From Swiss-Prot:
Species: Haemophilus influenzae (strain PittGG)
Cofactor: binding details: Binds 1 zinc ion per subunit.
Enzyme Commission no: 3.6.1.-
A GO MF term: metal ion binding
Family: Belongs to the TRAFAC class YlqF/YawG GTPase family. RsgA subfamily.
Taxonomic lineage from the root: Bacteria, Pseudomonadati, Pseudomonadota, Gammaproteobacteria, Pasteurellales
Function: One of several proteins that assist in the late maturation steps of the functional core of the 30S ribosomal subunit. Helps release RbfA from mature subunits. May play a role in the assembly of ribosomal proteins into the subunit. Circularly permuted GTPase that catalyzes slow GTP hydrolysis, GTPase activity is stimulated by the 30S ribosomal subunit.
Record-given protein name: Small ribosomal subunit biogenesis GTPase RsgA
């Protein structure tokens, strides 16, 4: 009997499980007895690694810690209870014992592990886009869906505007007006020339923010401008793909001199939404909300359905046709992705 050939997905899963097994086999857990640890204290996770995390205490001191096995997940921004060891063991200074309930979190779908949290307790999501390699309103809309579902205030930042001629700049401003019309804040900046960087740092001082955006849009350059001492590695835009190379290896929370915190994470280069269904995506479009539920049919797909209130609002100029088209493009892409991955919401 011929041996059944494994599918590509099955092969990937086997390779992933094998790698995880080898990692567990090689890892030597550090065992902390109770008498080796000090009193419980509060802290914030400022960096997360594969099996460790850096925790900052209330005095601003940072300690590398192990995680109790009972902790299901831990991300940058988490507020935790931890205990410092009486001495370091293999470079580790303490143990994280509990995580306080999160005010919010942003997550991305992971092919093997399901929905994977990226960061927690965020006040603002900074959506960074750029004129190079291209301005994609579709990508901006994807990030805005995440913001709306997580109920986190967004700021749309267009970087590298120094590359624009005045005529091009006006064209870009006209494209972005559809977001201003529905209440989103826009900031056109240049990390190179410094244009509007003071406004950006003033907004960042208002809480904890996280940068999101494709590689090559200048996130690392912005961090270098805001925090020169950090010197985040800057990657060039690939001439062949138009996408920048990975420049950040671990999620990190930075304290800003003027106040506020900034989280930079490599886990948000590709912000997949294939874990969401059509209803959730629809709720991610804020200007749709006032007409939802008023269509003639309850199962309206908001396409050519008779009596569609959403399509009627577009025809009347109350809703941007660009946003409407991006919405359906996103719904269609989700169906294709789930089919390719054999993914189910059940």
């Amino acid at each position: 009997m011929a041996k059944r050939k494994l599918t590509q997905n099955q092969t990937r899963r086997i390779q992933s499980n094998n790698a995880k097994t080898l990692h567990r086999h090689k890892k030597k857990d550090i065992e902390w007895s109770d008498e080796m640890l000090g009193e419980s204290q509060e802290g914030v996770v400022v960096t997360r690694y594969s099996i460790h995390a850096d925790v900052e205490n209330e005095q601003g001191e940072i300690y590398r810690c192990n995680l109790r096995r009972t902790l299901s997940s831990l991300v940058v921004g988490d507020k935790v209870v931890w205990r410092k060891g009486n001495e370091q063991l293999q470079g580790v200074s303490g143990v994280i014992e509990a995580i306080h309930p999160r005010e919010n979190e942003i997550s991305r779908p992971d092919y093997y592990d399901g929905l994977k949290p990226i960061a927690a307790n965020i006040d603002r999501i900074i959506i960074v886009s750029a004129v190079l390699p291209t301005l994609s309103l579709n990508i901006i809309d994807r990030y805005l869906v995440v913001c709306e579902i997580a109920e986190i205030k967004p700021l749309i930042v267009l970087n590298k505007v120094d590359l624009l001629a005045q005529e091009q700049r006006q064209e870009i401003e006209d494209q972005l007006k559809i977001y201003q019309d529905i209440g989103y804040e826009i900031l056109m900046i240049s990390a190179k020339s410094g244009e509007n960087m003071e406004k950006l740092t003033a907004l960042l001082a208002q809480g904890t923010a996280i940068f999101v955006g494709q590689s090559g849009v200048g996130k690392s350059s912005l961090i270098n401008h805001i925090l020169p001492s950090v010197n985040a590695q800057v990657g060039d835009v690939s001439e062949t793909s138009g996408l920048g190379q990975h420049t950040t290896t671990s999620s990190r929370l930075y304290h800003l001199p003027q106040g506020g915190n900034l989280i930079d994470s490599p886990g948000i280069r590709e912000f997949g939404l294939w874990h969401l269904d059509a209803e959730q995506i629809t709720k991610g479009y804020r200007e749709f909300q006032y007409v939802l539920g008023t269509c003639k049919f309850r199962d309206c797909k908001h396409l050519s359905d008779p009596g569609c209130a959403l399509r009627e609002a577009v025809e009347q100029g109350k809703i941007s046709p660009v946003r409407y088209d991006n919405y359906h493009r996103l719904i269609e892409s989700l169906s294709e992705t789930k089919s390719q991955r054999h993914f189910s919401l059940v």
